[in-house]
């Protein structure tokens, strides 16, 4: 369920939600079929059962605030464990048990040259952070540690577009992603800077 308020400046979404449809998204990388450029390993390898990503979401609530056209801040909290697909075969096994933790993710987006009156090339900068409240096993010594967290940055920029090609979306785009997580807690950090 989604409700938009104040001329769509505030958006509230509640229900079975996937984080990979709302957060840590690069528009330019979405053109590729390769899963490497989708939801980053930084999150899905560091969250229980891959986190709240395709093909199953979890119970969650997302709030987005867009005070001006160029800026959006969004925050969401999700059930912390969607359970493995061999346990949660139909995607409707919910548990709000604090033992499984909760995933809280925040993202700020700054956009430029996005409307039809803009003369420059469009771009977007995103910065985000996430926290998972469950206990995690340290992969190096097996010790149980409270919580896990990380951050990320994403840049999308159109570098070249022929006159009149705005509607087709054709042109030369660049994107870069950089992120990290709490050291020694989990297995991966990521950098992705294709040209």
Q: Which ranges hold each PLM region?
A:
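Residues that define the transmembrane beta-barrel architecture of outer-membrane proteins
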Residues: 55-59, 100-104, 147-153, 188-192
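Loop-centered beta-sheet repeat module
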Residues: 68-136
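Residues on the lipid-exposed face of transmembrane beta-strands in outer-membrane beta-barrel proteins
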Residues: 1-3, 61-65, 106-110, 153-157, ...
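Outer membrane beta-barrel
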Residues: 1-82, 186-190
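Short loop/turn motifs that connect adjacent beta-strands in outer-membrane beta-barrel proteins
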Residues: 6-9, 70, 113-124, 160-172
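Extracellular loop and loop/strand-boundary signature of outer-membrane beta-barrel proteins
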Residues: 46-49, 89-97, 140-142, 180-184
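Transmembrane beta-barrel strands of outer-membrane/channel proteins
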Residues: 12-18, 73-79, 123-133, 172-180, ...
């Amino acid at each position: 369920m989604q409700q938009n308020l104040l001329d769509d400046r505030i958006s509230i979404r509640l229900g079975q939600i996937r984080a990979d449809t709302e957060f840590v998204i690069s528009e330019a990388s979405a053109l590729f079929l390769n899963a490497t450029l989708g939801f980053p390993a930084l999150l899905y390898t560091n969250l229980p059962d891959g986190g709240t990503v395709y093909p199953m979401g979890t119970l969650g609530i997302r709030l987005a605030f867009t005070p001006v056209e160029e800026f959006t801040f969004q925050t969401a909290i999700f059930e912390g464990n969607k359970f493995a697909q061999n346990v949660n075969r139909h995607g409707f096994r919910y548990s709000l048990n604090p033992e499984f933790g909760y995933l809280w993710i925040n993202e700020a987006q700054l956009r430029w040259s996005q409307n039809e009156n803009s003369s420059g090339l469009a771009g977007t900068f995103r910065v985000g952070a996430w926290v998972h409240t469950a206990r995690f096993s340290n992969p190096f010594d097996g010790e149980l540690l409270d919580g896990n967290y990380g951050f990320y940055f994403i840049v999308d920029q159109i570098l070249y577009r022929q006159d009149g090609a705005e509607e087709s979306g054709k042109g030369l785009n660049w994107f870069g992603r950089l992120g990290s997580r709490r050291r020694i807690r989990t297995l991966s950090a990521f950098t992705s800077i294709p040209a």
